[in-house]
Regions:
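Hinge/beta->alpha junction and helix N-cap segments in small-molecule ligand-binding domains
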Residues: 88-99, 119-128, 178-188, 204-248, ...
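N-terminal helix-turn-helix DNA-binding module of bacterial transcription factors
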Residues: 1-79, 347
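Flexible loop/turn connectors
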Residues: 248, 253-347
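Alpha-helical recognition/docking segments in bacterial nutrient-uptake
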Residues: 1-9, 18, 80-84, 88-191, ...
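Periplasmic-binding protein-like
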Residues: 140-146, 202-204, 234, 254-264, ...
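Short acidic capping loops at alpha-helix termini that bridge into adjacent secondary structure
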Residues: 199-201, 228-231, 282-287
Length: 347
């Protein structure tokens, strides 16, 4: 069999030219000094309108773009903000819709303000070190954190280095924090199940090294204690796999349970699968309530009753707080966004 040969045509392909227009070339084209061009491109308002227009016209003709690093030395601004997610890329870019919703909220606000979003994942020690060097090295104007774990020291380190910080999930930091009403949302869910006549209400709690995991478990315990009911607890890590495993554990430990509050919709999806495998009907045998109201909740079988938290609004609120910090304004130390119970067919 004859081998096909590669066909080439023309000369070698070269990369883009490395010589970029300089301030001096713009100044010569505009007929002004280099200092005048520098003031115009750095946004200073002390330049006469006619000179500014001449500089802008010359820059457009030459295709001049200000060098970001050099400009930041003058303005002390990079016009970019980092969002750090202390998870692995595999977790952030998975079927967990919490992260894309937060990113979308942050990006929409920063884009409207003319700022760039820098996304960093720090699921390993090496990634955390890289993020630390990047942020404290002056590459961004501020850092936002979401999905924080107790052991994560980066927020405190950033604050000590003078980096503006906004977080979701660690209210004890000396930085603005955006969170949701975990307690109120969970208590509404448990009270709904009690009103339905459910007597043995279990929970699949979230990770206990996160504020969301602890607060939702606290809300569950408080609501059951008020009704003089016993807590039945298994713990997951906000993944579907952990919800499946925790539900199997609950059925083995408490076969008579008739309801379960699951601390995330993704874990609830896994719990529903475990209930089907065990031959339990939902909501006939066991009622199920989740937390998040991500798109998955409407696709579950049956559609999931859940506590809606405004995930994209968490991102938008974080970005707005950061923009206010960067402008030198005061920001509320703690913002709590409301939750609401969305009733569907699983309970």
């Amino acid at each position: 069999m004859r081998r096909a040969e590669a066909v080439t045509g023309g000369g070698p392909v070269r990369g883009p030219r490395t010589g970029r227009p300089t301030l001096e070339e713009v100044a010569e084209r505009a007929g002004v000094s280099r200092a005048t061009v520098s003031r115009v491109v750095n946004g200073q308002t002390t330049v006469a309108e006619g000179l500014r227009q001449a500089v802008e016209a010359a820059a457009n003709e030459l295709g001049y773009v200000p060098h970001a690093a050099a400009r930041s030395l003058v303005t002390h601004r990079t016009d970019s903000v980092a969002l750090i997610l202390p998870e692995s890329p595999n977790r952030v870019f998975s079927d967990d819709q919490f992260f894309p919703s937060v990113i979308r909220g942050v990006a929409s606000e920063l884009d409207a303000a003319g700022k760039l979003l820098v996304l960093l994942t720090t699921g390993s020690a090496e990634a955390r070190s890289r993020a630390e060097r990047y942020a404290v090295g002056g590459h961004v104007d501020g850092v936002m954190f979401a999905s924080l774990h107790d052991a994560d020291l980066l927020p405190e380190l950033m604050l000590r280095r003078g980096v503006p910080v906004v977080c979701n999930g660690l209210p004890h930091l000396a930085a603005p924090c955006i969170d949701v009403d975990h307690l109120g949302g969970v208590q509404a869910a448990v009270e709904f199940l009690l009103a339905k006549g459910r007597r043995r209400i279990a929970t699949v709690a979230g990770p206990q090294d996160m504020v969301a995991g602890r607060a939702r478990l606290d809300g569950y315990r408080q609501a059951l204690a008020a009704a003089d009911r016993r807590a039945i607890v298994a713990v997951g890590d906000f993944t579907a796999e952990s919800g499946h495993a925790a539900m199997r554990q609950l059925l083995a430990d408490e076969p008579e349970l008739d309801a379960v509050f699951v601390a995330s919709d993704l874990m609830a999806h896994g719990a529903l699968q475990a209930l089907r495998e065990a031959g339990r009907s939902v909501p006939g045998d066991v009622s199920v309530v989740g937390f998040d109201d991500i798109a998955l909740a409407t696709y579950c079988d049956p559609p999931l009753t859940t506590v809606r938290q405004p995930i994209a609004e968490i991102g938008r609120s974080m970005a707005r707080a950061m923009l206010r910090l960067l402008e030198g304004h005061e920001v509320e130390p703690l913002t709590i966004l409301p939750t609401e119970l969305v009733i569907r067919e699983s309970a």
